[in-house]
Amino acid sequence: MSLHSTFKKISPTTLLKQEDWEGLCLYFSQHPEKVRDSAGNEQNIILFAIACLRKDETDVGLTLLSDRVLTAKNGRDLLRRWVISPLASSQPDAVLQVVNKLLAVNVCQPEDVLLVASVLLKSKQYATVADLAEQAWLAFSGNSQIFALHLRTLVLMDKELQAISLARTQAQEVPPRGDMIATCLSFLNKSRLPEDHDLARALLPFFALERQESAGLAVDTLCAVGKYQEAIQTGESALARGLDGAALRRSLGLAYYQSGRSREAKLQAAEHWRHALQFNSDNVRIVTLYADALIRTGQNEKAIPLLQQSLATHPDLPYVRAMYARALRQVGQYTAASDEFVQLAREKGVTSKWNRYAAAALLQAGKTSEAESVFEHYIQARASHLPQSFEEGLLALDGQISAVNLPPERLDWAWEVAGRQSGIERDEWERRAKWGYLADNFLLDWLECRGEQADEPMYRLADISHVEQFFQRLQLDQRGCIIVSAHLGAMYAGPMILSLLEMNSKWVASTPGVLKGGYGERLISVSDKSEADVVRACMQTLHSGQSLVVAIDGALNLSAPTIDFFGQQITYSTFCSRLAWKMHLPTVFSVPIWKNRHIHFVLERMVDPLKFESQLSFTERWKENYLQCVTRILQSDPENLRLSGGIWRNIIRRDS
């Protein structure tokens, strides 16, 4: 029997079912009248187009798919069965063109779009998927899955605000569409606008918490409006009802973590993230949350293998590498830590803060020459961006205020503690506070990077004759004293003032011990020494008759102890008060402050131990004295808030 006679007897439908694409093409080549562009041939033309597309003859196949052919009976169904489904993974570009043609004539179905979009997303063709999703949303404006896809692709195209705006519009529909709520919540929670968070919360009564993902989303929504305890109750209630999974555990851990910075809250958060990892061990977000909580509760040994695993699969994530380096340093693996910090410094550039960490880590690893080289390059790079004079730079700070981006909870807390009673309008108060933040950081840059011009900031000093008189009245003789400070005011002016007064003192700071010049010679660096080494250096300083300067609200260790202060947990060390009690030394609270953009020096003699007073009693009384001093600085001019480091590190949004 000849091949020609065989094809006469086999129908195109049979060849289609046999997936005999060569046979189909041959059949229609022998019967050209069946695929002529005329009424009644639409079904055959569809089959011919399918055969061409399956043979990878894309241009021919697409040409055959005219609007009339596409809208013929069963046209879309045949294309879905024989082209879209089987070719989406292997020939996504061809399938995309078919889907776009179907969309253009309004016969496409949402599942066609979702299938090809999922494939294109895996290959990171975000712009292509975004265009497809936008067209699909016009065609299927009521479809919840297309809505979610459209918003997701907008975010991938850096159009998050547009995505949030669409979510906002949809969320305002009355009554709310139940199948749209999850997507609306996800995007409204990302918004920076409090009214969007309130809108999201208003949707919760209509949101069915039937799955652990939905419960997790409800927890996130409550956290976004500061209802942490309600969020915790919602999450724990879902667990009690048998809902459990990575999403819920992740969100519940965040609720505990955001509810307070106490060790107990961090431990509870860590426990939920540990469970989340059991459901999804490859989720980098959960791994890093868990590792961060472990580090902040002093469990560095447990965090290290988790972070190692994450870096092995995601070596391009700097925040993971930073946590890994910190954990290594805390357990004494200084060489390994220095390697990680050096890599961070290289990746982030010569002016990044990681060069400071790298220099300190190299010193701890015994690599002094490398540390000096890294820090010197860091100094030179920063110096190249500084103005010609200190005055020029200080005057330019007003123009930089609008670019300052600080955690809003710090400003909110400071406003409640100090700003509201100041009589200054909130906007002006914030502007002045941000100027103080810029000014102290500029002062640090200048003193570190322009050693030959280190005298220039001194022209901004007010009369400091009272400082010398104050210390003379202490009648120290051959003894030193303990000068305590906080991350407030013009903090970095402190060493400069004491140097100007030729006071025999050393200062404890996180600056690496490779800093050159007079300030460097008086430095006890906490960043390149163990805690035991720092304690020994401080004791030796005081025993030698020198004074010691310490900002006791600072700590490199993320698990450093905290105390309650105006409803927040702030870092606080009892080291100085215990030393004062043990060595019978006077203590002084001291902070350089800004007043009319000049630097003044606040000094206050702190309480001494009473006769036969126990250490516990004294340290408690001394702590209250210290916090009173800190409060007075906070409630002075807003320029003196400083807003970073020390007491500011753990400030969180309070449960509303």
Curated annotation (Swiss-Prot):
The keyword Transport applies. This is Vi polysaccharide export protein VexE. Pfam families: TPR_19 (PF14559). The keyword Kinase does not apply. Keywords: Polysaccharide transport, Sugar transport, Transport. May be involved in translocation of the Vi antigen. NCBIfam families: PRK15174.1 (NF011721). InterPro entries: TPR-like_helical_dom_sf (IPR011990). One of its GO terms (biological process) is polysaccharide transport. It comes from Salmonella typhi. The gene is vexE.
